[in-house]
């Protein structure tokens, strides 16, 4: 019985204010990564839609066909070539946004890895920092 009391006392770890701040930072960054990954998926779908639109315009036979292009809440008709250029520019901008978001995810993952090392070093098996797969 004395051995189990000593084991329980050894596992009782004091959580300091700094430790709590690290745990909170880990939770905030984990939540932020989830949001960023969802945003990346939305932007990738938008990029795919733009690529599909480019492909459809290329397949159009009529070069003098006016193609409506949405700007804000209105559609403005442009020539096939102008619309193609606008779509290419939109694709380029969207890809840059995706790259920036992925870069932010990578930097947050580095912070999380560092925090995970620090927190596991102090708390060991008394803390679970692994994401739920549900």
Curated annotation (Swiss-Prot):
It is found in: Nucleus; Cytoplasm; Mitochondrion. GO terms for molecular function: amyloid-beta binding; protein-folding chaperone binding; unfolded protein binding. One of its GO terms (biological process) is chaperone-mediated protein folding. The modification Phosphoserine is found at residue 125. The keyword Protein biosynthesis does not apply. The modification N-acetylalanine is found at residue 2. Keywords: Acetylation, Chaperone, Cytoplasm, Mitochondrion, Nucleus, Phosphoprotein. It comes from the Eukaryota. One of its GO terms (cellular component) is prefoldin complex. InterPro entries: PFD_beta-like, PFDN4, Prefoldin. Its main location: nucleus. Binds specifically to cytosolic chaperonin (c-CPN) and transfers target proteins to it. Binds to nascent polypeptide chain and promotes folding in an environment in which there are many competing pathways for nonnative proteins. Heterohexamer of two PFD-alpha type and four PFD-beta type subunits. Interacts with URI1; the interaction is phosphorylation-dependent and occurs in a growth-dependent manner. Belongs to the prefoldin subunit beta family. This is Prefoldin subunit 4. It comes from Homo sapiens (Human).
